[in-house]
Amino acid sequence: MASAAEGDMEAELTRGLLWGFQDLSLNKLATSLGASEQALRLIISIFLGYPFALFYRRYLFYKDSYLIHLFHTFTGLSIAYYNFGTQLYHSLLCIVLQFLILRLMGRTITAVLTTFCVQMGYLLAGYYNTATGTYDIKWTMPHCVLTLKLIGLAMDYYDGGKDQKSLTSEQQIYAIWGVPSLLEISGFSYFYGAFLVGPQFSMNHYMKLVRGELTDVPGKIPNSTIPALRRLALGLVYLVGYTLLSPHITEDYLLSDDYENGSFWFRCMYMLIWGKFVLYKYVTCWLVTEGVCILTGLGFNGLDEYGTAKWDACANMKVWLFETTPRFTGTIASFNINTNAWVARYFFKRLKFLGNKVLSQGLSLLFLALWHGLHSGYLVCFQMEFLIVIVERQAASLIRDSPVLSRLASITVLQPLYYLAQQTIHWLFMGYSMTAFCLFTWDKWMKVYKSIYFLGHVFFLSLLFILPYVRKVMVPRKEKLKKME
């Protein structure tokens, strides 16, 4: 009887322990936080960068380069496996293909074009084969980061074969003069501080890290702990805020009957608030990963004029500008900085032969839309960005050149009202653009746009055609002649 009772107790205890472990599973934890298991894995993986960075600082700084490349490759592959399982083969395959392209085709335009077609083609095929009606965290997420890295690598390698005098000062900084090995390309690609969500950085910058050059104290480990912790702390603030508010400010509500039946002004205000809030998940990830990059030294960006170390080489966010700017161009300049810099360096500036800056900008935004995915919402979002930036520049130029508008804009007592009006317009139409980006399928974003009567398109297309006529009336002829001269 006693043994039977003990057996029952053991069975009960085993069931209790199993239930406890199940209760502590990632899925249950994610559910309790209002997130998906994949999202929780992503956050855990990003934070894992800190112990990896500490290990690197303690044991590998100034060690043999092959050890550092192996460490970065192993940790990056581990993160890939933890998040995507055996689907990590996609990144491995593209890295090996890129190595072969560079070795077999050399420093040729053929290698650059082949790289662009192969890497972008693979990414777009991945988008096509994994597409669903909702946003999912899958292997294509880090792969889009990798795609830009490998295309940039091919272009820098190509520049390294040119006469140095024919390169711009920027191209000379990034040009690769040596021949990267497979291990070097792997370490560069899988670096744990940027593999999942960025930021973008060049092979040359990565190799400076490996050689121990990215430090404010030559010959010693960088004094980057405090700057890294500051970015981590700021990232945690955004993470807590997003976690607490995300159950109450959702994109699903935009599709609900409750939203559609609300007043027009309510629909606009909800879109404004949601448009600001939805970006915080990206801000969180980039601030946390920036802290990892700073901790390793990758974030070192030289010294300022006072001899103080700058740690913004991997900054993907200018938080103060992001939170305070009343302009769309200000948000663009403060958000996803390194990706925007990559597009400017490797795409926009390389289209100079077209002789048309607006066309180059439009093609760059089209590339960004395709890079994000094949859904129509991405195209609509970046089309709106293109339109808004053009109109904003027209409006700024009109106010600057018109004596009447310039005097009105300079009235101090009215500055708070101007700022409030600008911020309202700014974030309302940021939310309008982000609606297509986040809902991304035709039926979803079209439903929301119909509910607010395509306000963003009507407002900015109207201004695009009206502002030139307003300029003729408001800007004196002498100002126009002076500008032409």
From Swiss-Prot:
<keyword id="KW-0594">Phospholipid biosynthesis</keyword>
<dbReference type="GO" id="GO:1903573">
    <property type="term" value="P:negative regulation of response to endoplasmic reticulum stress"/>
</dbReference>
<dbReference type="GO" id="GO:0047184">
    <property type="term" value="F:1-acylglycerophosphocholine O-acyltransferase activity"/>
</dbReference>
<feature type="active site">
    <location>
        <position position="336"/>
    </location>
</feature>
<feature type="transmembrane region" description="Helical">
    <location>
        <begin position="283"/>
        <end position="303"/>
    </location>
</feature>
<keyword id="KW-0472">Membrane</keyword>
<dbReference type="GO" id="GO:0036150">
    <property type="term" value="P:phosphatidylserine acyl-chain remodeling"/>
</dbReference>
<dbReference type="GO" id="GO:0045540">
    <property type="term" value="P:regulation of cholesterol biosynthetic process"/>
</dbReference>
<keyword id="KW-0256">Endoplasmic reticulum</keyword>
<dbReference type="GO" id="GO:1905885">
    <property type="term" value="P:positive regulation of triglyceride transport"/>
</dbReference>
<feature type="transmembrane region" description="Helical">
    <location>
        <begin position="108"/>
        <end position="128"/>
    </location>
</feature>
<feature type="transmembrane region" description="Helical">
    <location>
        <begin position="420"/>
        <end position="440"/>
    </location>
</feature>
<feature type="transmembrane region" description="Helical">
    <location>
        <begin position="232"/>
        <end position="252"/>
    </location>
</feature>
<comment type="similarity">
    <text>Belongs to the membrane-bound acyltransferase family.</text>
</comment>
<dbReference type="GO" id="GO:0016020">
    <property type="term" value="C:membrane"/>
</dbReference>
<keyword id="KW-0812">Transmembrane</keyword>
<comment type="function">
    <text>Lysophospholipid O-acyltransferase (LPLAT) that catalyzes the reacylation step of the phospholipid remodeling process also known as the Lands cycle. Catalyzes transfer of the fatty acyl chain from fatty acyl-CoA to 1-acyl lysophospholipid to form various classes of phospholipids. Converts 1-acyl lysophosphatidylcholine (LPC) into phosphatidylcholine (PC) (LPCAT activity), 1-acyl lysophosphatidylserine (LPS) into phosphatidylserine (PS) (LPSAT activity) and 1-acyl lysophosphatidylethanolamine (LPE) into phosphatidylethanolamine (PE) (LPEAT activity).</text>
</comment>
<dbReference type="GO" id="GO:0034379">
    <property type="term" value="P:very-low-density lipoprotein particle assembly"/>
</dbReference>
<keyword id="KW-0443">Lipid metabolism</keyword>
<keyword id="KW-0012">Acyltransferase</keyword>
<feature type="active site">
    <location>
        <position position="372"/>
    </location>
</feature>
<feature type="transmembrane region" description="Helical">
    <location>
        <begin position="139"/>
        <end position="158"/>
    </location>
</feature>
<keyword id="KW-1133">Transmembrane helix</keyword>
<keyword id="KW-0808">Transferase</keyword>
<comment type="pathway">
    <text>Lipid metabolism; phospholipid metabolism.</text>
</comment>
<dbReference type="InterPro" id="IPR004299">
    <property type="entry name" value="MBOAT_fam"/>
</dbReference>
<keyword id="KW-0007">Acetylation</keyword>
<dbReference type="GO" id="GO:0106262">
    <property type="term" value="F:1-acylglycerophosphoethanolamine O-acyltransferase activity"/>
</dbReference>
<dbReference type="GO" id="GO:0036152">
    <property type="term" value="P:phosphatidylethanolamine acyl-chain remodeling"/>
</dbReference>
<feature type="transmembrane region" description="Helical">
    <location>
        <begin position="448"/>
        <end position="468"/>
    </location>
</feature>
<feature type="transmembrane region" description="Helical">
    <location>
        <begin position="176"/>
        <end position="196"/>
    </location>
</feature>
<keyword id="KW-0444">Lipid biosynthesis</keyword>
<feature type="modified residue" description="N-acetylalanine">
    <location>
        <position position="2"/>
    </location>
</feature>
<feature type="transmembrane region" description="Helical">
    <location>
        <begin position="362"/>
        <end position="382"/>
    </location>
</feature>
<dbReference type="GO" id="GO:0090158">
    <property type="term" value="P:endoplasmic reticulum membrane organization"/>
</dbReference>
<dbReference type="GO" id="GO:0050728">
    <property type="term" value="P:negative regulation of inflammatory response"/>
</dbReference>
<dbReference type="GO" id="GO:0071617">
    <property type="term" value="F:lysophospholipid acyltransferase activity"/>
</dbReference>
<dbReference type="GO" id="GO:0030258">
    <property type="term" value="P:lipid modification"/>
</dbReference>
<feature type="short sequence motif" description="Di-lysine motif">
    <location>
        <begin position="482"/>
        <end position="485"/>
    </location>
</feature>
<dbReference type="Pfam" id="PF03062">
    <property type="entry name" value="MBOAT"/>
</dbReference>
<keyword id="KW-1208">Phospholipid metabolism</keyword>
<protein>
    <recommendedName>
        <fullName>Lysophospholipid acyltransferase 5</fullName>
        <ecNumber>2.3.1.-</ecNumber>
        <ecNumber>2.3.1.23</ecNumber>
        <ecNumber>2.3.1.n7</ecNumber>
        <ecNumber>2.3.1.n6</ecNumber>
    </recommendedName>
</protein>
